[in-house]
Amino acid sequence: ASRELEHVRCYLNLERIRFGAHLRVEYAIETSDFFLPALSLQPLVENAVRHGVTKREEGGTIWISARETEESYQVTIRDDGVGFDPVRVRGDGREHVGIENVRSRLTAQCGGTLCIASQEGVGTVAQVRIPKTGDTQGKESFDADHRGG
């Protein structure tokens, strides 16, 4: 996860140059010693910048945290941007390719999940969860077959 977090940090440094005081970023990284598929965070952070905080006249803040729980690793990307109505977005007929690609990579490569919650006028929270034990619905047989035993 440290490589993905570093890519996000570099991306946000560039965006902060572009948007100045309108884009604030805070980090709370307790752990980064776990597997995270490539390009599983940057699309979420890009959405927070492009569709969240920079849509507010006064800008806003993006908070990125990573922590370990007993059963999983969690990376949370939260913003205080404009938010959105999930029902309207789901029904607008557009495909949300970036988010679906992230969700697919997480599921396929590590049994992870992506949950997104948003409220208009409040902001958005995207949470990635990576189980410590891997995908319990199919990954065990793959692992057993490829462990050499």
Would you name each region that the model predicts?
Residues 1-117, 125-127:
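Two-component histidine phosphotransfer core
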Residues 119-149:
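C-terminal end segment of the histidine kinase catalytic
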